[in-house]
C-alpha cells in the first residue's frame, strides 16, 4: 500500500513538473483535472485525498524580477509645465464676472426682504448679478420699470389736467368774483359765487385737486428707492464703490464736484414747469407757478450731499419724465390714450399775468383779509350765543359811568335830527366793533 501511495505521488509530481528548463508562464493545453483523473484510474486504487501546495517556484522569475524592480525604482514624476502668471486685474466682462462671483449676496449683507425697500434691493441685485449690468445701469433700468408701472396713473392725470385747462377762463371768472367778495366783505356774493363755481365743476366733472392727487402715488415709490439706495450706500455694498460712471465712479458717496445735484435740480425744474407729472402747466394756475419755481432751489441745499446712487435714480426718473411729456404732446398718442386736446384760449379773455413779487403780495393780502373775515364771524357767533343764553343787555346813548353836571343833563337823542342819524353808527358795528 505504501508503494502504491508513493507511485501515485510520483505521478502527481511528474505532472506538476515544468516541461522546460527555464520558467515560463505557458501551461499545458490538457486540463490538469483530466490528467489527475487518468492517473488515478491507471493505478486502480481507491482515491486518496491529496493537498497540492503551490510553491513560489510556480511564479515566473521574470515576473518576480519585474515586481522587485518596480519596488526598488524611485517613482517617476512627470514633467509639468509652469502655469502662466494670471494678471491681477481682468479686463472687460471678465472683471465683472470675477467680481460678481466673489462679492457677497444681499442676504449675507443683511439687505433684501419682502418689504417695498427689500423688494427694490432684490430687483437691483438681480439686474446687476444675473443680467450683468453695472450698478448705474441697474439703477436706471429699475427706475424705468417702476415708472412704466405708474404710467397709467400719469395718463389719467393728463386727462384731468387737459379738462381743467379747457375750462380755465370760466374758472378764473368765478375765482375773481369770490376774491372781490372777500375784499368787500360781502358774504352773500361770496357764497353765491362759491355755489355757482361748485355747480359748474360738478356739471363738467372738474376736480382741481385730482391731477395733483394721482401723481402723489409716486411718493411711496420715490421714498422706497431713496431708502433702498441709501442703505446700500451706507453699508456699503463693495461693488457699489466701483459701479459708477465717468467722474462719479463711487456711488456710495456724494458727487465730489456737485455736478449731479445741479443737473438733477435743473431737470426737476423743467419737469415741474412743463407739468410732466401732473399735466397742469405752471401758467395755468398762478399760485402753482410760484411754488413750482421756488421748490427746486429750496430742495437743493438739503439734497446736495446725498449719495450718487440716489442722484442716479433721481436723474433717470427726471429724464424719463421729460421724454414722457414730449411723447404725450404728440396728437396721435393723445388720441390713442383718450387725452383731450388742449384748447388755445384768447389771451384777451384771460386775466393778465403778474410778476412773482406782485402776486406774492396779493396772495398775502388775500390771506389777511380771509383771516379778518374769520375773526369777524367768530365774534358775531359769540354775541349770538350770549344773546341766546341770557337776557338782552341794556344799551345807552351815552356812557353811564361818566359823571355829568346836574345843570347839564345828557341830551336825549332827537329822532328828527338828521345830523344825528347821519353820524349814528350801525347797531351791529357798535356791538361787534
Curated annotation (Swiss-Prot):
Topological region Mitochondrial matrix: 130-134, 229-255, 315-433
UniProt GO molecular function: membrane insertase activity; mitochondrial ribosome binding; protein homodimerization activity
Comp. bias regions, Low complexity: 413-426
Residue ranges, annotated region (Disordered): 397-433
Topology of this chain in the membrane: Multi-pass membrane protein
Mitochondrial intermembrane side: 1-108, 156-207, 277-293
GO (cellular component) term, any one: mitochondrial membrane
Subcellular location, record wording: Mitochondrion inner membrane
Keywords: Membrane, Mitochondrion, Mitochondrion inner membrane, Phosphoprotein, Transit peptide, Transmembrane, Transmembrane helix
Transmembrane segments: 109-129, 135-155, 208-228, 256-276, 294-314
Residues the record lists as Phosphoserine modifications: 359
GO biological process: aerobic respiration; mitochondrial protein quality control; mitochondrial proton-transporting ATP synthase complex assembly; mitochondrial respiratory chain complex I assembly; protein insertion into mitochondrial inner membrane from matrix; protein tetramerization
NCBIfam families associated with the record: yidC_oxa1_cterm
Similarity annotation: Belongs to the OXA1/ALB3/YidC family.
PANTHER family: MITOCHONDRIAL INNER MEMBRANE PROTEIN OXA1L (PTHR12428:SF66), OXA1 (PTHR12428)
Role this protein plays: Mitochondrial membrane insertase that mediates the cotranslational insertion of integral membrane proteins into the mitochondrial inner membrane. Essential for the activity and assembly of cytochrome oxidase. Required for the correct biogenesis of ATP synthase and complex I in mitochondria.
Protein name, UniProt field: Mitochondrial inner membrane protein OXA1L
The species this protein was found in: Mus musculus
Underlying gene: Oxa1l
Amino acid at each position: 500500500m505504501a508503494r502504491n501511495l508513493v507511485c501515485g505521488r510520483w505521478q502527481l509530481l511528474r505532472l506538476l513538473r515544468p516541461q522546460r528548463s527555464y520558467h515560463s508562464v505557458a501551461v499545458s493545453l490538457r486540463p490538469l483535472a483530466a490528467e489527475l483523473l487518468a492517473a488515478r484510474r491507471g493505478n486502480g486504487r481507491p482515491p486518496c485525498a491529496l493537498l497540492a501546495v503551490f510553491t513560489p517556484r510556480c511564479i515566473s522569475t521574470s515576473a518576480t524580477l519585474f515586481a522587485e524592480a518596480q519596488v526598488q525604482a524611485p517613482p517617476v514624476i512627470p514633467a509639468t509645465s509652469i502655469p502662466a502668471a494670471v494678471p491681477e486685474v481682468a479686463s472687460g466682462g471678465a472683471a465683472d464676472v470675477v467680481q460678481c462671483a466673489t462679492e457677497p449676496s444681499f442676504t449675507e449683507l443683511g439687505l433684501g426682504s419682502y418689504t417695498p425697500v427689500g423688494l427694490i434691493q432684490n430687483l437691483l441685485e438681480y439686474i446687476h448679478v444675473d443680467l450683468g449690468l453695472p450698478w448705474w445701469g441697474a439703477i436706471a433700468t429699475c427706475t424705468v420699470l417702476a415708472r412704466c408701472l405708474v404710467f397709467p396713473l400719469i395718463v389719467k392725470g393728463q386727462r384731468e389736467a387737459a379738462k381743467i385747462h379747457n375750462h380755465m377762463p370760466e374758472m378764473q371768472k368765478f375765482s375773481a368774483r369770490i376774491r372781490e367778495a372777500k375784499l368787500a366783505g360781502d358774504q352773500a356774493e361770496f357764497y353765491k359765487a362759491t355755489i355757482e363755481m361748485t355747480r359748474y365743476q360738478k356739471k363738467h366733472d372738474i376736480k382741481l385737486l385730482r391731477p395733483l392727487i394721482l401723481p402723489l402715488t409716486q411718493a411711496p415709490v420715490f421714498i422706497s428707492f431713496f431708502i433702498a439706495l441709501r442703505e446700500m450706500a451706507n453699508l456699503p455694498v463693495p461693488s457699489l464703490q466701483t459701479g459708477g460712471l465717468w467722474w462719479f465712479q463711487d456711488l456710495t458717496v456724494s458727487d465730489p464736484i456737485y455736478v449731479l445735484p445741479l443737473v438733477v435740480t435743473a431737470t426737476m425744474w423743467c419737469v415741474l414747469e412743463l407739468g410732466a407729472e401732473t399735466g397742469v402747466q405752471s401758467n395755468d394756475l398762478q399760485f402753482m407757478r410760484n411754488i413750482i419755481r421756488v421748490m427746486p432751489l429750496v430742495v437743493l441745499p438739503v439734497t446736495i450731499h446725498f449719495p450718487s446712487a440716489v442722484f442716479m435714480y433721481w436723474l433717470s426718473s427726471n429724464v424719463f419724465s421729460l421724454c414722457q411729456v414730449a411723447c404725450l404732446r404728440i396728437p396721435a398718442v393723445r388720441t390713442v390714450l383718450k387725452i383731450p386736446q388742449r384748447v388755445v384760449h384768447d389771451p384777451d379773455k384771460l386775466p393778465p399775468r403778474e410778476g412773482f413779487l406782485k402776486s406774492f403780495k396779493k396772495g398775502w393780502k388775500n390771506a389777511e383779509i380771509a383771516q379778518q373775515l374769520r375773526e369777524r364771524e367768530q365774534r358775531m357767533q359769540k354775541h349770538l350765543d350770549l344773546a341766546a343764553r341770557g337776557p338782552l343787555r341794556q344799551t345807552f346813548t351815552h356812557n353811564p359811568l361818566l359823571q355829568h353836571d346836574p345843570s347839564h343833563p345828557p341830551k336825549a337823542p332827537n329822532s328828527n335830527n338828521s345830523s344825528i342819524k347821519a353820524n349814528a353808527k350801525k347797531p351791529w358795528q357798535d356791538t361787534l366793533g
